């Protein structure tokens, strides 16, 4: 989590020993180049499908919400927002011992409703932009875990643009 991503956009190039969400997600970018042991193909296909779902958001606004050792020690939370689509993605990485963090999202329409989906827990909630900008709680059960969230302006809100 320490590198050029604080100054330049995500590159999507990495080498790793295992397919763990924490390591994989911290290296997503416009493209994906992997150096992996040939393991179960299904797992690799899942990683590629998840990265492809994230990819359109890398062309939007980038907000580093929490950086390790700042307001939430051990957490890094990044938001990529496509205001033109009313959608975005949030990556949360827990490297420390504090299993909870609050992330205040940016660039949302405070008066609109959004559907917030946590990929890891399969939970979806409807929440206002104002509430997401006031802070969404993020929880993991142990260090070196990540959470991936997608948000979409609700269909009725998007049709009223």
Report the location of each language-model feature.
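Active-site-proximal substrate-binding groove within the catalytic cores of carbohydrate-active enzymes
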Residues: 1-123
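C-terminal beta-strand-rich structural cap/linker in extracellular carbohydrate-active enzymes
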Residues: 127-161
């Amino acid at each position: 989590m320490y590198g050029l991503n604080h100054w330049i956009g995500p590159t999507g190039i990495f080498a790793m020993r295992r397919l763990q969400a924490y390591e994989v997600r911290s290296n997503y970018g416009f493209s994906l180049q992997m150096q992996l042991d040939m393991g179960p193909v299904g797992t690799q296909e899942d990683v590629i499908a998840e990265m492809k779902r994230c990819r359109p958001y890398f062309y939007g606004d980038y907000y580093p919400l929490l950086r390790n050792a700042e307001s939430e020690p051990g957490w890094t939370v990044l938001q990529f927002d496509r205001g033109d689509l009313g959608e975005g993605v949030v990556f949360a990485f827990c490297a420390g011992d504090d299993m909870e963090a609050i992330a205040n999202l940016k660039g949302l329409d405070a008066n609109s409703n959004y559907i917030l989906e946590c990929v890891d827990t399969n939970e979806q909630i409807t929440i206002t932009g104002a509430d997401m900008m006031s802070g969404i709680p993020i929880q993991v059960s142990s260090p070196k875990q990540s959470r991936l969230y997608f948000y979409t302006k609700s269909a009725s809100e998007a049709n009223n643009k």
